[in-house]
């Protein structure tokens, strides 16, 4: 028995409505979590962020410190920065880092790695194979 397109579509939506579907991105960066101690700002989940991005803590540390124009150090998975910074300022730096050093410029995939070709640091996408030069920190 032939059914109309509308009937089939309605039936499909009824079946979908029974399922509790939650759409999540495969790549979710943890929001920055800070703590202030006097004139210092501590990024408490620094190690977790670096691990999620699949980048070394040292590389992310150098980018944040240079971008903010401050001094800092890594202490037990936390980033301690000289100066008072807001969560939004630090989140902006992490988002900029992801845009420049993590996401593929061709397919937007986070599955990338650093390689060196003739003394030039390159970002190679493991999904599409594209390679792009990135600026040294």
Curated annotation (Swiss-Prot):
SMART domains: eIF2B_5. It holds the Pfam family eIF-5_eIF-2B. It comes from the Archaea. The keyword Cytoplasm does not apply. Keywords: Initiation factor, Protein biosynthesis. Belongs to the eIF-2-beta/eIF-5 family. eIF-2 functions in the early steps of protein synthesis by forming a ternary complex with GTP and initiator tRNA. Heterotrimer composed of an alpha, a beta and a gamma chain. This is Translation initiation factor 2 subunit beta. The gene is eif2b.
